[in-house]
């Protein structure tokens, strides 16, 4: 990258799990917090991109993201509006549940405001813990 090209940056995208959040420590690092603050102070739009649903997007004290790409960009929004929504077709959801059942893994199904799982294992519990949440296991 050219030395002068940094001033041309208008938006920065960040994944949550493994990028913003250290997966071993389950927290955002102080260095990342400072980096995000520096970008924001320089007028760069901060975008969080994640596979998580909107209600599982973690918040980070002192950091104000502008745009959120949730559910792997199938649901995109700002604080004021939904920009894009493209839910997974029901037939595909059924196939995912069946395939997961065959390998004895729980599945969490979710919408914009919440969801539930057909069971829970350590991987799923750890994933929810990053957003300071618990798996909602349905009967």
Give short role names for the model-derived ranges.
Residues 4-8, 25-28, 45, 65-70:
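Short hydrophobic/aromatic-rich motifs at helix boundaries and adjacent loops
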Residues 8-25:
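Asp-based phosphoryl-transfer active-site loop
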Residues 128-139:
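Short, intrinsically disordered, charge-balanced linker/junction segments flanking boundaries
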Residues 19-20, 27, 62, 87, ...:
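Residue-level preference for alpha-helix termini and adjacent loops
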């Amino acid at each position: 990258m050219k030395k002068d090209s940094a001033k041309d940056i208008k938006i920065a995208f960040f994944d949550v799990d493994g990028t913003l959040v250290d997966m071993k420590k389950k927290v955002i690092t102080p260095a990342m917090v400072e980096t995000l603050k520096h970008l924001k102070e320089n007028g760069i739009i901060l975008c969080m991109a994640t596979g998580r649903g909107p209600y599982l997007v973690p918040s980070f004290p002192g950091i104000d993201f502008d745009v959120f790409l949730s559910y792997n960009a199938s649901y995109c929004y700002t604080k004021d509006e939904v920009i894009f929504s493209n839910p997974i077709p029901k037939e595909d959801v059924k196939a995912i549940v069946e395939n997961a059942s065959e390998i004895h893994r729980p599945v969490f199904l979710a919408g914009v405001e919440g969801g539930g799982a057909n069971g829970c294992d350590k991987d799923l519990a750890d994933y929810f813990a990053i957003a300071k949440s618990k798996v909602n296991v349905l009967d």
